[in-house]
């Protein structure tokens, strides 16, 4: 599933082509996504794009009279293409722009979303989200406060959007490795020093992935059709049985809350 770096990469890629241009119309080929494509999107016509923002894993397209909320789901990606390029099997939504470009949404598994809202504040998909991990609100003191009485393993807790948004399976595994923290550790067992370190490395790992265009394991593509190159730098995720890049110990795979977790038994305590 695209996580924060992939969504932010998409935002940065599409923003220059959308802001200042006008949506001439939308072409919805298959509206049966995780939730049905909002009726307002079908009727879009002559709507200038004022901004392209991100909250958690949601892309937010600001129009004069409302917002388009886009979620990439498990396998979605957004590309900027010439208007005349024919659509393929899994290309479900196009926004046809006044500059001759098309914003094309591709999603083989159709688990994403295209929603419309007049007001962002209070919308059900955005209402109960934690802080952005790259903001000043997310720091060691905040993390320690939220972990202090939490009797659950730190790995699934990091993936809870009420704690912090956008840190999915890949980046939780990678951040815990970078901090030297075992994913089975109870959140409440983390010291102040460990919380400070973990908050810092989460920011560093996410920023590095954004620099590399995110992580492509299967479906994700940047807006120009290129893969995300952070996959080449993964330290533990997807490397079961391979030697740890630090100590040589084979990487272990386990399940936490039905999600695969990867770690090094030697480097993470």
From Swiss-Prot:
Record keywords, A-Z: DNA damage, DNA repair, DNA-binding, Glycosidase, Hydrolase, Lyase, Metal-binding, Multifunctional enzyme, Zinc, Zinc-finger
Catalysed transformations (reactions): Hydrolysis of DNA containing ring-opened 7-methylguanine residues, releasing 2,6-diamino-4-hydroxy-5-(N-methyl)formamidopyrimidine; 2'-deoxyribonucleotide-(2'-deoxyribose 5'-phosphate)-2'-deoxyribonucleotide-DNA = a 3'-end 2'-deoxyribonucleotide-(2,3-dehydro-2,3-deoxyribose 5'-phosphate)-DNA + a 5'-end 5'-phospho-2'-deoxyribonucleoside-DNA + H(+)
InterPro entries given in the database record: DNA_glyclase/AP_lyase_DNA-bd (IPR015886), DNA_glyclase_Znf_dom_DNA_BS (IPR015887), Formamido-pyr_DNA_Glyclase (IPR020629), FPG_cat (IPR012319), MutM-like_N-ter (IPR035937), Ribosomal_uS13-like_H2TH (IPR010979), Znf_DNA_glyclase/AP_lyase (IPR000214), Znf_FPG/IleRS (IPR010663)
Gene3D superfamilies the UniProt entry points to: 1.10.8.50, MutM-like, N-terminal (3.20.190.10)
Active site: 2-3, 57, 259
Molecular function as annotated in GO: 8-oxo-7,8-dihydroguanine DNA N-glycosylase activity; class I DNA-(apurinic or apyrimidinic site) endonuclease activity; damaged DNA binding; zinc ion binding
Record has GTP-binding as a keyword: no
One Pfam family matching this protein: zf-FPG_IleRS
Zinc finger (FPG-type): 235-269
GO terms for biological process, alphabetical: base-excision repair
EC number in record: 3.2.2.23, 4.2.99.18
Cofactor dependence: Zn(2+)
Cofactor mode of binding and number, as noted: Binds 1 zinc ion per subunit.
Residues reported to bind DNA: 90, 109, 150
Assigned protein family: Belongs to the FPG family.
Quaternary structure annotation from Swiss-Prot or TrEMBL: Monomer.
Chain's role: Involved in base excision repair of DNA damaged by oxidation or by mutagenic agents. Acts as a DNA glycosylase that recognizes and removes damaged bases. Has a preference for oxidized purines, such as 7,8-dihydro-8-oxoguanine (8-oxoG). Has AP (apurinic/apyrimidinic) lyase activity and introduces nicks in the DNA strand. Cleaves the DNA backbone by beta-delta elimination to generate a single-strand break at the site of the removed base with both 3'- and 5'-phosphates.
Protein name, per record: Formamidopyrimidine-DNA glycosylase
Organism: Citrobacter koseri (strain ATCC BAA-895 / CDC 4225-83 / SGSC4696)
Biological classification of the source: Bacteria, Pseudomonadati, Pseudomonadota, Gammaproteobacteria, Enterobacterales
Gene it is expressed from: mutM
């Amino acid at each position: 599933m695209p996580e924060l770096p992939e969504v932010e990469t998409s935002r940065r890629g599409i923003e220059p082509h959308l802001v200042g241009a006008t949506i001439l119309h939308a072409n919805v080929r298959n509206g049966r996504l995780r939730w049905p494509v909002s009726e307002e999107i079908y009727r879009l016509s002559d709507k200038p794009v004022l901004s392209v923002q991100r909250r958690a894993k949601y892309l937010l397209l600001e129009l004069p009279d409302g917002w388009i909320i886009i979620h990439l789901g498990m396998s979605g990606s957004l590309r900027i293409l010439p208007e005349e390029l024919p659509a393929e099997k899994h290309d479900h939504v196009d926004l046809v722009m006044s500059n001759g470009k098309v914003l094309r949404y591709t999603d083989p598994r159709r688990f994403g979303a295209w929603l419309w809202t007049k007001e962002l504040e209070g919308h059900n998909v955005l209402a109960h989200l934690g802080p952005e991990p790259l903001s000043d609100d997310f720091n060691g003191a905040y993390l320690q406060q939220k972990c202090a009485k939490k009797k659950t393993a730190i790995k699934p807790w990091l993936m809870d959007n009420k704690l912090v948004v956008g840190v999915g399976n890949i980046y939780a595994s990678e951040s815990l490795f970078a901090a030297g923290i075992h994913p089975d550790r109870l959140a409440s067992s983390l010291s102040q020093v460990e919380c400070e370190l973990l908050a810092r490395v989460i920011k560093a790992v996410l920023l590095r992935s954004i620099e590399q265009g995110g992580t492509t394991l299967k479906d994700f593509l940047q807006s120009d059709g290129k893969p995300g190159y952070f996959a080449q730098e993964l330290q533990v995720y997807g490397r079961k049985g391979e030697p740890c890049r630090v100590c040589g110990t084979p990487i272990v795979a386990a399940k936490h809350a039905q999600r695969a977790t990867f770690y090094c038994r030697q480097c993470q305590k």
